[in-house]
């Protein structure tokens, strides 16, 4: 142990600075067949071509709000790791209770 307390780098040598990949337009990773499979699971038979971009936009805004709330819970607990309970509580706050992950 280096004696620097919980999670602190302290003085002296820090870790290597890593280059982070700049993420842009990752929502396109939700492919057309993936959206089609989700719709099929929901009982949809035919899908308009305009739906795919709309679904991506709705999914992105939903995930942004859940992640924002989850990170708020994490920061309040003075942690750096988002836990499954943080996500469960964030979903519960938005009125979408999720069972099976504790809490």
UniProtKB/Swiss-Prot annotation:
The protein's name in its UniProt record: Histone H4
Post-translational modification: Glutarylation at Lys-92 (H4K91glu) destabilizes nucleosomes by promoting dissociation of the H2A-H2B dimers from nucleosomes.
Naturally occurring in which organism (per UniProt): Saccharomyces cerevisiae (strain ATCC 204508 / S288c) (Baker's yeast)
Predominant subcellular localization, coarse grouping: nucleus
PANTHER family registered for this protein in UniProt: HISTONE H4
Bias (Gly residues) ranges: 1-14
Gene expressing this chain: HHF1
Residue positions, PTM N6-glutaryllysine: 92
Alphabetical UniProt keywords: Acetylation, Chromosome, DNA-binding, Methylation, Nucleosome core, Nucleus, Phosphoprotein
């Amino acid at each position: 142990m280096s004696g620097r307390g919980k999670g602190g780098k302290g003085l002296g040598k820090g870790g290597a600075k890593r280059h982070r990949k700049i993420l842009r337009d990752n929502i396109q990773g939700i492919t057309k067949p993936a959206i089609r499979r989700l719709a099929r699971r929901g009982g949809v038979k035919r899908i308009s071509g305009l739906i795919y971009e709309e679904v991506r936009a709705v999914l992105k805004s939903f995930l942004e709000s859940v992640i924002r709330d989850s990170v708020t819970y994490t920061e309040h607990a003075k942690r750096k790791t988002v836990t499954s309970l943080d996500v469960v509580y964030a979903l519960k706050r938005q009125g979408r209770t999720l069972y099976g992950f504790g809490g």
